[in-house]
Amino acid sequence: MSYVNDVLQNLIAKNPGEAVFHQAATEVLESIAPVIEANPAYEKAGILERLTEPDRAILFRVPWVDDQGKVQVNKGYRVQFNNAIGPYKGGLRLHPSVNLGVIKFLGFEQIFKNSLTGLPIGGGKGGSDFDPKGKSDREVMAFCQSFMTELYKYVGADIDVPAGDIGVGAREIGFLYGQYKRITGLYEGVLTGKGLTYGGSLARKEATGYGLVYLMKEMLATKGESFEGKRVVISGSGNVAIYAAEKATAFGGKVVALCDSTGWIYDEAGVDLAAVKQIKEVERKRLREYKNYRPNAEYHEDGVIWDVPCDIALPCATQNELHLEHAETLIKNGVIAVGEGANMPSTPDAIHAFQKAGVLFAPAKAANAGGVATSALEMSQNSLRLSWTFEEVDQRLHGIMVGIFNQMAAAAEKYGHAGDYVVGANIAGFVKVADAMLAQGVV
């Protein structure tokens, strides 16, 4: 542990004020300590020092003109963290909370998530503190074109392939891709999450949510449980939450609550997903509109969604949204399983509480890997100049998620932590990347 502790202390000292990056690195490094101790070659080669330092961190300004003719300037980021097993791969996040520490945390997590998929993709992440909410289509286009005018220098189908994340959906990907193509003249798979008319993949929108539920299904089965007849609470109302709800419902669960950034809905009869899709995907409005479709449902702007009793909880909104007190409430109300659809949505003390109480817990880097897995399948289709059917992509996704579960379960058991999927996911993701780094020398 002394080597691990030394690396962590050095990381914290060299990256002050980046709390979420410290949190992510601490969780991973502490859980892989048994592997490090069993393999002295990792320390000799400085694997941890190299793994926790990005290959490069790109920071740039993004000037654009709003609808009033005023010049606005945002910060743009792309952190290319590790490409030992493939080109950098990870989303772009547009949100006021974005800073270098947030992007580094997301990029670091992406290394292990991408490794777990079994596909040849490295880890990266990017974004900006630009807020697309309340902006016109023209303003979003102006921002995206300016952002790509700088980013295009650093990305490419075999170099770095960004995708969507919070604030970046089909509209934004379209604007970004159009500008890349205009500047470079290249029609290549440089972005994933593209529209179906210009190289996108069927099932990409559904992938993260579906993948989460596929993995949860495997995990529940280890205890003789399933989604059938279970009450499910899901935070968020974006792609991950909506399609996790859709697949959980298909497996016999009853989704009773969803939320967005202004409030949450509770529908004892089961959430009407058609209404939610209309509100969020078509009208781009708030969940408060849900009562117009289901008058008997409840809408709350106070309290938290985790107060709703449930059997299965799926945090799918944002990092550190589920705290210790929320975990204690869920445990008291009889939750049996928690799966992270967002990136690091549970605080460390919340995770510890779930594990101590015997609640099945699926960490984000495994549970939400379906999105990036299907992005990699989109890359494959672009390279092959083919388009697979929805069923074929979904079948491949299901196989990948089963494989991820089996990997992390086996790794946890091998190192004496059977049933601890946090440790299992970290170890399984780490070993593949570390061994590739060893093979490639000190680079």
Report each predicted region and the residues it spans.
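Conserved active-site and cofactor/substrate-binding residues in soluble primary-metabolism enzymes
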Residues: 2, 16-23, 27, 42, ...
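Adenosine-phosphate binding glycine-rich loop
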Residues: 2-24, 219-220, 331-443
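Flexible, glycine/charged-enriched surface loops at secondary-structure junctions
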Residues: 19-22, 38-47, 118, 155-164, ...
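Structured beta-strand/loop patches that form or line metal/cofactor-binding pockets in enzymes
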Residues: 41-70
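Glycine/serine-rich phosphate-binding loop and adjoining beta1-alpha1 elements at the start
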Residues: 95, 114-228
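Glycine-rich phosphate/diphosphate-binding loop of Rossmann-like nucleotide-binding domains
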Residues: 192-195, 200-309
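Rossmann-like adenosine-cofactor binding region
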Residues: 263-361, 366
